[in-house]
Curated annotation (Swiss-Prot):
HAMAP family: HrcA. Keywords: Repressor, Stress response, Transcription, Transcription regulation. InterPro entries: GAF-like_dom_sf, HrcA, HrcA_C, WH-like_DNA-bd_sf, WH_DNA-bd_sf, WHTH_HrcA_DNA-bd, WHTH_transcript_rep_HrcA_IDD. This is Heat-inducible transcription repressor HrcA.
Amino acid sequence: MDYRELTARERQILGIIIQSYVVSAAPVGSKYIARHYNLGLSDATIRNVMAELEELGFISQPHTSAGRVPTDKGYRYYVDLIMTVKTLDEQEKQRFEQHITPLERKGTSADVLLSAVKVLGTISRQLSVVLSPTLSNALFEKLDMVLLSSTRMMVIISIQSLFVKTIVMELHMQVSRQMLDEVVDVLNERLSGLTLSEIRRSINQRLADCSCDNELKNLIVRSAGTLFDEMPVFERLYISGTEYLVEQPEFQQPEKVRDLITMLEDKFSVATLVEQHHANNPDVTITIGKEHGKRQAEDLTVLSAPYYVGDMVGTVGILGPKRMDYEHAVRILHYMAGSLSSTLSIQN
């Protein structure tokens, strides 16, 4: 976003307005600033600076108040050019580690992600989201098949000792346990160590000379796009802290609560909001208000960051009102992303 370069005084006043509004949820006036901040400026001078900030679109005046509140543009300027993010303090680090570190050796990846999203929600006091990694670059480890009935079987795919994907398939043929075992052995022998995307592209050629049951083999080849594709969003998504979001003053109006709950029930929509970072950029990405391009999300800020497990990339995020303690949210999100990367890499 392009800005007119603000003066030091304008930046200071804008920062104070945002920080005060975050704490109080009440519009901020010039008299409040003059009384509570030792700026060496008169009420009139502060009022003139605020008038200029309003003219530039960084703050606005609610209809029922003499004070001002930040606009999306004001928040964007603040997070891009004003705020400074400190490292996590030791007490917050301990709160993270006491929940996550014990899972390094005894917990599954799902245990780690579920614990992580709960801890993040508790510490941030916002709605928190964790998405398990996308799997195209993940290494296939092994596969098993279990007959559920004469017409259905379950395929269980293990990925890098961390993630398990299960799919139930319909059978239109008679299949014995021996036939399953033969196909499973061939698949594991020829596909183990390949990425899922490599398998999708080349499974037909890799099994072309297979002497195992052709009908079952052909079913697996035809279904490769599903079997070795990404897990569906509802299996990848972990959410915690919805209660913190709906308690915020911004969402007390019934229609806003209804819109918010409707959006949160759409897991694909939530995943789309938080997966806006670039996989090769470890920094926290912040998207504010109308930048989302979704009417239901115009009152929200979304922060997201990638975490890494080998070549796999997952996402951790925070959703909250635009009136958010951005410095705190950024530092805990950055720490959580790093913690997940190290914890899951140890498991791997």
